[in-house]
A protein has these predicted regions:
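Short, intrinsically disordered, mixed-charge
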Residues: 22, 54, 90, 128, ...
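Conserved Switch II/interswitch segment of TRAFAC-class P-loop GTPases
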Residues: 40-45, 72-82, 93-155, 168-182, ...
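Glycine-rich, flexible loop/turn motifs
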Residues: 23-31, 38-40, 48-51, 80, ...
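Flexible interhelical turns and helix-capping residues at alpha-helix boundaries
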Residues: 9, 131-134, 194
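Amphipathic alpha-helical transducer elements in NTP-driven molecular machines
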Residues: 32, 46-49, 62-68, 82-96, ...
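Conserved G1/Walker A P-loop phosphate-binding module
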Residues: 1-111, 139-140, 144-145
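C-terminal-of-GTPase-core extension/linker across diverse P-loop GTPases
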Residues: 2-6, 17, 146-353, 360, ...
Length: 365
């Protein structure tokens, strides 16, 4: 999973990236501190594999991972090449989902490119640039197929779709709210355009420390972000990038104490992971043994052979059966052999849909 972190200059984007990845990316109080996208691989916090590791006395515990890309700050006019616009738009096309950091804190020491704090304006600035970029892509497609569409029914059908999506964008709406016809061709065409505004989006409302305890409930800027996200089907989570940066330097025990003192249940990374898995429809299954306990990320609805293929393509090709036990059942039993004796280990075939928290042993030829 690859997430692109975007936002206007000086909203806390690189500070958040630094704290999530501990990568120490250059973070400065001026536009375009991030010129090339910084990339960081982050472990997905999951206590299940830690506990499985203890149960199996395993040599190695391997969590699932998320790749974060810190993409250069964006300004008005990026779709026409202003600032670092073209580079920004090329980088963002490669990600699975967008994490849009929005400034919801007041601080006279940190300049805002537009001189004031206004999340609605900031969101619209970036969204409009993404829309303009998508319209340009659709215009290029229209120019390519319009002439041939007069004599080709399939291209005529695609042209109708492209023009409908373009009209939707010209109304200021994101492509992800466009209702694609329930038709296989239309679905394939729409996906093939790889539109920026079709990508799932998570808004990170970056607040001051005082707004964390009530999850931004008393912050009018956060309320506006939530309202706009609801209209476009996006997720929102509240974060204080400055606090996340401090947490990144602490041990797990110190982190817990610090969060308790703040009156906060989970870190920003935990919130972001939960939002990412939710908006992308992802789950994790687990494999366990003395050599390694590991979490694997798959789409909800994935069947056993395809899940096996995440481990190795040979597992999918030669799939025979999957031995499956629920993580909590295995933990309660204290040993795989006990879970088997109690009839909690099931033998599943190729049509089995893998569930979150399944501990699986694949049998393959």
């Amino acid at each position: 999973m690859k997430l692109g972190i975007v936002g206007l200059p000086n909203v806390g984007k690189s500070t958040l990236f630094n704290s999530l990845t501990k990568a120490g990316a250059l973070s400065a109080n001026y536009p375009f501190a991030t010129i090339d996208p910084n990339i960081g691989i982050v472990s997905v916090p999951d206590e299940r594999i830690v506990k499985l590791g203890e149960l199996y006395h395993t040599k190695k515990v391997t969590p699932a991972t998320i790749e974060f890309v810190d993409i250069a700050g964006l300004v008005k006019g990026a779709s026409k090449g202003e600032g670092l616009g073209n580079q920004f738009l090329a980088n963002i096309r490669e990600v699975d989902a967008i994490v849009h950091v929005v400034r919801c804190f007041e601080d006279t020491n940190i300049i805002h490119v537009d001189g004031s704090i206004d999340p609605a304006r900031d969101i619209e600035t970036i969204n409009l640039e993404l829309i303009f970029s998508d319209i340009e892509i659709l215009d290029r497609r229209i120019a390519k197929i319009a002439k041939q569409a007069r004599m080709d029914k399939t291209l005529a059908k695609e042209l109708e779709l492209v023009e409908a999506v373009k009209a939707h964008l010209e109304d200021g709406k994101m492509a992800r709210s466009f209702e694609v016809p329930d038709d296989e061709d239309a679905q394939i065409w729409f996906k093939g355009y790889n539109l920026l505004t079709a990508k799932p989006t998570i808004y990170a409302a970056n607040v001051a420390e005082d707004d964390l305890a009530d999850d931004g409930a008393s912050n009018p800027h956060v309320a506006k972000v939530r309202e706009m996200a609801a209209e476009e089907g996006a997720k929102v989570f509240v974060i204080c990038a400055q606090i996340e940066q401090e947490l990144a330097e602490l041990s797990e025990e110190e982190k817990k104490e610090y969060l308790d003192d703040l009156g906060v249940e989970s870190s920003g990374l935990d919130k972001l992971v939960a939002a990412s898995y939710s908006i992308l429809g992802l789950i994790s299954f687990l494999t366990a043994g003395e050599d390694e306990c590991r979490a694997w990320t798959i789409k909800k609805g994935t069947k056993a052979p395809q899940a096996a293929g995440k481990i190795h393509t040979d597992f999918e090709r030669g799939f025979i059966k999957a031995e499956v036990v629920n993580y909590q059942d295995l933990l309660d039993c204290g040993a795989y052999s006990v879970a088997r004796e109690k009839g909690l280990v099931r033998l599943e075939g190729k049509d089995y849909v893998v569930q979150d928290g399944d501990v699986i042993l694949f049998r393959f030829n």
